[in-house]
């Protein structure tokens, strides 16, 4: 059996393998209203990770007996396209995709005002077009932006980032190498204006002090992401006004 040797993640000049500083985000691009047949849609890119999200609804639930009397039902599908990774994947939903659909749905339920739309359903589809670490968070943010594009009332947008440990150092917004070879990976998503955490997972090990510093580092990154999200919505609104 071939033993793969762990690559050096932090170079001698103190930078990461992709040239970023330890506390630097990957380039972010957000595009709204990309699908004409959806009620709301968005493409969210973080580095080489790219996700498209589409929202349909609120609409009447079929069959009707499944409708909830006091709020809307939320159906969420997270899916990685067969061409999203180096190795072609089976198009059938994997256990990981089913689990992440559930995790993302629970995070979205904390912000959507579902009680305003009883007996209806909102469908959210997320397709990972390119995967290079952080797909669950990018998918969650793409869904949040698509919901805003659809005009569905929310308590706040969701912004998130992963903080990890690579070669003993805390790093913001992991790339694929750091995700694969790092000692820890902690994705965090929040409702920034409310300071409410809606997703927090830790894979690997951090000391209590590292956890505290990682959380502070994540908050710094989330603040920058939230500003870009609001800017994208503002630009979309200005486009509508000009039309």
From Swiss-Prot:
Component of the archaeal exosome complex. Forms a hexameric ring-like arrangement composed of 3 Rrp41-Rrp42 heterodimers. The hexameric ring associates with a trimer of Rrp4 and/or Csl4 subunits. Gene3D superfamilies: GHMP Kinase, N-terminal domain. Catalytic component of the exosome, which is a complex involved in RNA degradation. Has 3'->5' exoribonuclease activity. Can also synthesize heteromeric RNA-tails. It is found in: Cytoplasm. Keywords: Cytoplasm, Exonuclease, Exosome, Hydrolase, Nuclease. GO terms for biological process: gene expression; rRNA catabolic process. One of its GO terms (molecular function) is 3'-5'-RNA exonuclease activity. The keyword Ribosomal protein does not apply. This is Exosome complex component Rrp41. Coiled coil: none annotated. Its EC number is 3.1.13.-. Belongs to the RNase PH family. Rrp41 subfamily. GO terms for cellular component: cytoplasmic exosome (RNase complex). It holds the Pfam family RNase_PH. It comes from Sulfolobus acidocaldarius (strain ATCC 33909 / DSM 639 / JCM 8929 / NBRC 15157 / NCIMB 11770). It comes from the Archaea.
């Amino acid at each position: 059996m071939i033993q793969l040797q762990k690559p050096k993640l932090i170079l001698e000049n103190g930078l990461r393998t992709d040239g970023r500083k330890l506390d630097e985000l990957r380039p972010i691009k957000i595009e709204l209203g990309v699908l004409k047949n959806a009620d709301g849609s968005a493409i969210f890119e973080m580095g080489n990770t790219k996700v498209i999200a589409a929202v349909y609804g609120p609409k009447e639930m079929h069959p009707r007996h499944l409708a909830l009397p006091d709020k809307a039902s939320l159906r969420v599908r997270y899916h990685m396209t067969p061409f999203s990774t180096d190795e072609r994947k089976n198009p059938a939903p994997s256990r990981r995709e089913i689990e992440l659909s559930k995790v993302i749905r629970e995070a979205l339920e904390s912000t959507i005002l579902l009680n305003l739309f009883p007996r209806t359903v909102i469908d959210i589809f997320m397709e990972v077009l390119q995967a290079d670490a952080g797909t669950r968070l990018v998918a969650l943010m793409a869904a949040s932006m698509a919901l805003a594009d659809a005009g569905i009332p929310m308590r706040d947008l969701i912004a998130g980032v992963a903080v990890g440990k690579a070669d003993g150092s805390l790093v913001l917004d992991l790339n694929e190498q750091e995700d694969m070879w790092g000692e820890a990976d902690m994705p965090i998503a929040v409702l920034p204006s409310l300071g409410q955490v809606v997703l927090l997972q830790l894979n690997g090990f951090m000391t209590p002090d590292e956890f505290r510093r990682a959380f502070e580092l994540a908050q710094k990154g989330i603040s920058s992401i939230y500003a870009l999200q609001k800017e994208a919505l503002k630009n979309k609104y200005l486009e509508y006004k000009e039309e």
